Amino acid sequence: MSRRRVIQRRPIPPDPKYNSRLVTMIVRRIMRHGKKSVAYNIVYDAFKAIEERTDSDPLELFEKAVRNLTPLVEVKARRVGGATYQVPMEVRSDRGTTLALRWLVQYSRSRGGKTMAMKLANELMDAANETGSAIRKREETHKMAEANKAFAHYRY
C-alpha cells in the first residue's frame, strides 16, 4: 500500500429522477447482487409512499432523515500497552453520511413489513421525526463516546 499520496475519490453521479447524489448513495447501499434497477425501484417506491402519506416533498424528508441520523462522534478501538481503549473521535462529514445511510438500510431490512420499499419509507419517516431504530443507534453511538470521554487524549 503506497503512502505517497491521497487517492482521489470518484465523483458520485446524481440520480436521474431527483438529481441528488444522496439518492444515488442510498441506492448503492440497498443494491444487492449488482441489481441497481431493482434498488432504484425500491427507493422510488418508498419516496412515492412517503409523498402519498405526508403530502410533502420526499427528497426533503429524506435529507432531513439523513441529517438527523448523522453522528457527530464515534468510538474507535486503540491499543495502548496491552489494553484496548474505546477512543472517541469526531466524525468527518462524508463518513457521517455513510454511517447514516448504512444504519438506515440496516434497520429498514430488519423492520417488519411487506416490501422493502414500505420498510424503507417507514424508517425514513421515523428518522425524520427523530424516532426509530436507526436514531436509537445514533444515540447509542453518542452515549458510548460520552462514556469514554476520559480516553479522548489517546486520539490519533
UniProtKB/Swiss-Prot annotation:
InterPro entries membership: Ribosomal_uS7, Ribosomal_uS7_bac/org-type, Ribosomal_uS7_CS, Ribosomal_uS7_dom, Ribosomal_uS7_dom_sf
Sorted UniProt keywords: Ribonucleoprotein, Ribosomal protein, RNA-binding, rRNA-binding, tRNA-binding
GO molecular function: rRNA binding; structural constituent of ribosome; tRNA binding
Signal peptide: none
Listed Pfam families: Ribosomal_S7
Gene3D superfamilies: Ribosomal protein S7 domain
Keyword Ribosomal protein: yes
GO cellular component: small ribosomal subunit
GO biological process: translation
NCBIfam families for the chain: rpsG_bact (TIGR01029)
Name the UniProt record assigns to this protein: Small ribosomal subunit protein uS7
Species of provenance: Trichodesmium erythraeum (strain IMS101)
Source taxonomy: Bacteria, Bacillati, Cyanobacteriota, Cyanophyceae, Oscillatoriophycideae
